[in-house]
């Protein structure tokens, strides 16, 4: 049976290194505390995703990532584009500092970041007060789940709980753009 988490339960689960599922703008996501290497490695093992690919993090405020990203390294117009798009369904690859953990960035010199306007994600991030991994709740190479009912039972059996809610109206996962160049990396 799937354990449904309140926001307070979700925060406690994340603090303890747990992995949770939650609805996002287009699909169900898996999340954990990106500051805890063991939690991220567990999430990646659940998904069967290589660590070198990196993960997206969501947050309620960009300043909680100040130790990991250097938004001021962007050209002023690019920085304005990024900040003006948030909160919203926009994921940007931001330049990282030397303190950004490789288990989050993978082999990349940037970190994928989104400040979501989705009500569940926004409330979860605000309650959590820290960055949160956001990767689709599916095994690598499989289609992402667009409803809680579509979450694989085998995947649900490996995680610590679910924050209930509905996915947003996007038909596809969020677009990913490089904040330095503006180039679209995933559409």
From Swiss-Prot:
Q: Alphabetically, which GO biological process terms does the record hold?
A: regulation of translational fidelity; tRNA threonylcarbamoyladenosine modification
Q: Does the keyword Chaperone apply?
A: no
Localization in the cell: Cytoplasm
Q: Which Pfam families does this UniProt record tie to the protein?
A: Sua5_yciO_yrdC
For this UniProt entry, which residues form the secretion signal?
none
This protein's record includes keyword Transferase: yes
Q: What is its main location?
A: cytoplasm
Against Gene3D superfamilies, the record matches this protein to: DHBP synthase
Q: Per the database record, which ranges form the YrdC-like domain?
A: 4-187
List the catalytic activities from the record: L-threonine + hydrogencarbonate + ATP = L-threonylcarbamoyladenylate + diphosphate + H2O
This protein's superkingdom? Bacteria
Task: Quote the EC number.
Answer: 2.7.7.87
Q: Report one GO cellular component.
A: cytoplasm
State the Gene Ontology terms under molecular function. Answer: ATP binding; double-stranded RNA binding; L-threonylcarbamoyladenylate synthase; tRNA binding
Keywords, in A-Z order:
ATP-binding, Cytoplasm, Nucleotide-binding, Nucleotidyltransferase, Transferase, tRNA processing
Q: What does this protein do?
A: Required for the formation of a threonylcarbamoyl group on adenosine at position 37 (t(6)A37) in tRNAs that read codons beginning with adenine. Catalyzes the conversion of L-threonine, HCO(3)(-)/CO(2) and ATP to give threonylcarbamoyl-AMP (TC-AMP) as the acyladenylate intermediate, with the release of diphosphate.
What family does the Swiss-Prot or TrEMBL record give for this protein?
Answer: Belongs to the SUA5 family. TsaC subfamily.
Record's protein name? Threonylcarbamoyl-AMP synthase
What organism is recorded for this protein?
Xanthomonas oryzae pv. oryzae (strain KACC10331 / KXO85)
- What broad taxonomic lineage does this protein's source fall under? Bacteria, Pseudomonadati, Pseudomonadota, Gammaproteobacteria, Lysobacterales
């Amino acid at each position: 049976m799937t354990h449904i988490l309140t926001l307070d339960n979700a925060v406690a689960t994340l603090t303890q290194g747990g992995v949770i599922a939650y609805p996002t703008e287009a699909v169900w996501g898996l999340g954990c505390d990106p500051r805890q290497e063991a939690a991220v490695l567990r999430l990646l093992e659940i998904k069967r995703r290589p660590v070198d690919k990196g993960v997206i993090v969501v947050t309620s405020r960009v300043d909680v990532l100040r130790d990991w990203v250097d938004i001021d390294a962007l050209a002023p117009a690019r920085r304005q584009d990024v900040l003006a798009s948030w909160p919203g369904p926009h994921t940007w690859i931001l330049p990282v500092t030397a303190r950004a953990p490789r288990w989050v960035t993978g082999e990349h010199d940037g970190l994928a970041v989104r400040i979501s306007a989705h009500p569940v994600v926004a409330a979860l991030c605000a309650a959590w007060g820290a960055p949160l991994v956001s990767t689709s709740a599916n095994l690598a190479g499989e289609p992402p789940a667009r409803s809680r009912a579509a979450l694989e039972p085998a995947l649900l059996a490996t995680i610590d709980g679910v924050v209930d809610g509905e996915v947003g109206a996007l038909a596809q996962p969020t677009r990913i753009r490089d904040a330095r160049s503006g180039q679209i990396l995933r559409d």
